[in-house]
Curated annotation (Swiss-Prot):
Keyword Translocase applies: no
Keywords, ordered alphabetically: Stress response
UniProt cross-references to CDD domains, sorted A to Z: ACD_sHsps-like
Naturally occurring in which organism (per UniProt): Rickettsia felis (strain ATCC VR-1525 / URRWXCal2) (Rickettsia azadi)
UniProt cross-references to Pfam families, sorted A to Z: HSP20 (PF00011)
Stretches assigned to the sHSP domain: 43-154
Listed name of the protein: Small heat shock protein C2
Keyword Chaperone on entry: no
Amino acid sequence: MAFNLPRIRNKSEVSNDLMRRNHLDNIFDDFFNEFYTFPYSSSTEKNLIPRTDISETDSGYSLEVELPGINQKDIDINIDNHILTIKGQKEEKSEEKNKNYHMRERYYGSFQRSISLPANINDDAINARFENGILHITIPKKEQGKTRKIEVKG
């Protein structure tokens, strides 16, 4: 009587299978990414989504947003209902429009990034500064209320 057990494979066979599977996954990812972005953009025209770091200290939150090549006057920051929205525009230089590009990887156009903030912020004291292509936003936390005893009356 023979057992119908799967064959034990060595490490290199498993590794090769995983590499093939990853390659196929990448092919499908590329295909569907192109499919879902068409006709709004092509692989050479990607949306400008600013890279953002958010950190927290005891006193507040700090955001650092990369905005290289953007002028300070083209940045707009708003807060509404604990949602911080950063909008901007990166203009393409008009003299560059007539060039015959062989490769084009820089981003141009408008962008918007919205970040939901926690409820414990003091939105009246938010500060922003723009330096060397980095937007620094400081969001202080509200001061915690002190506990007080409430007398129960009969």
